Every structure is written in structure tokens, then in C-alpha cells.
Design a protein with these regions (language model features):
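N-terminal presequence-like segments and the immediate start of the first folded domain
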Residues: 1-114, 118-123, 128-131, 138-191
Length: 191
């Protein structure tokens, strides 16, 4: 890997960063970038295959945004005849990576459900395959009642039974303009 590919300037690392990066094997004792070597344990046991999932009609990968982030929007794992979809926290963001419906919690929640639905559809899955959600609200005291009304309305419309397991948490989301974000896990048999 060339230094130019890094997002950090090695010459400006703190001593603590250098120590930890050496212990991780990223830097040599001379503070030079070490070439990455694939772990030998994977010669005997290959890592599980992971596939990035895309729904570009409604949102793009986070690393393609104007302010990029280093994570996949969603991953599909295949295990013993089942596929598992793991979706990162998803919010009311459009295909250009810009927040939609600033200040309108209810519209943001519906857009979030649309983005999640499109990610599920991209993998031939539906909300009936969802087993768990984690729901992040910027202001849980102000917005939870409306959140639960909309979520219940959506789930009832979908005729979900049983409902996915879920946890609700109040957090500061990545952008001040975002009021709600949801991550989910879905499991389905591979046809």
C-alpha cells in the first residue's frame, strides 16, 4: 500500500498512535508503513464470504458521499443454506448522500423505511425476513410516540407477525439534521 492511499499523514501521528499502530503491525519500528499480510489462519479456514449490497436508486454507499465514511451500507452473508443481511444504520438520506426532510421527523422515518425496504428488495428479501432492528432517535422523549405510531402502522400494513426484536436508543446521529436511523438484521433461506 502506498502512503498516498492513506487518509492520515504518518509524519503527524502522535506517539500514542505510533505505539498502537506498531502493536497492530501497521507500522514498523522505524514508523514505516508495513505491507499487509493476509492472516495465515485463513489458509486453513477461509473467511466467510461477504457481499456488499446496494440499492442505488435510493441511496449510495457511504464511501461515495461528499463526506465519505468507511463502512458498507449492507452486507450479505451465506451460511449453511441461509443468507443473512446486515444493514448498517440507515437514515433519511437520498441517492446523493444528502439528508431528506430536514426538521420533519415523520417524513424522515418514512424515507428511512423506504431506504431499508429497497435494501431488502435488492437481496430478494422483505420485512418478513427481518429478525431484529436497532432504532436510533436523536430525541427519544420528543419523538418516540410518533416513531412508535408510524412503525406500528407500517408493520401492521405489512402484516408482520411476529414483530422483529427491537431496541430503541437515544443518540447523537452522524449529522445534526438527521433525527432517526435504523439498522436491521434479516435472515432467509437461499433458494
Amino acid at each position: 500500500m502506498e502512503t498516498a492511499q492513506l487518509l492520515i499523514d504518518i509524519s503527524k501521528l502522535t506517539e500514542g498512535e505510533r505505539i498502537e499502530m506498531r502493536k497492530l503491525g501497521i507500522l514498523t519500528n522505524d514508523n514505516e508503513l508495513r505491507d499487509y499480510k493476509f492472516p495465515s489462519i485463513h489458509a486453513e479456514r477461509p473467511p466467510i464470504e461477504k457481499f456488499a449490497v446496494h440499492a442505488p436508486q435510493v441511496l449510495n454507499e457511504a464511501y461515495n458521499y461528499q463526506k465519505p465514511s468507511s463502512f458498507s451500507r449492507a452486507l450479505r452473508l451465506e451460511l449453511g443454506g441461509y443468507k443473512i443481511l446486515i444493514v448498517s444504520g440507515t437514515a433519511s438520506v437520498n441517492e446523493e448522500g444528502k439528508p431528506e426532510y430536514i426538521g420533519d421527523f415523520k417524513a424522515q422515518l418514512w424515507r428511512t423505511f423506504r431506504n431499508l425496504t429497497n435494501l431488502l428488495t435488492a437481496e430478494s428479501m422483505s420485512w418478513h425476513d427481518v429478525v431484529r432492528t436497532t432504532c436510533y432517535l436523536r430525541d427519544i422523549e420528543r419523538d418516540y410516540v410518533e416513531f412508535n405510531k408510524i412503525r406500528t402502522t407500517f408493520y401492521n400494513w405489512l402484516q408482520l407477525d411476529p414483530l422483529p426484536a427491537s431496541t430503541g436508543i437515544q443518540v447523537r446521529l452522524c449529522w445534526e439534521s438527521l433525527l432517526v436511523e435504523i439498522e436491521l438484521y434479516a435472515i432467509a433461506k437461499i433458494n
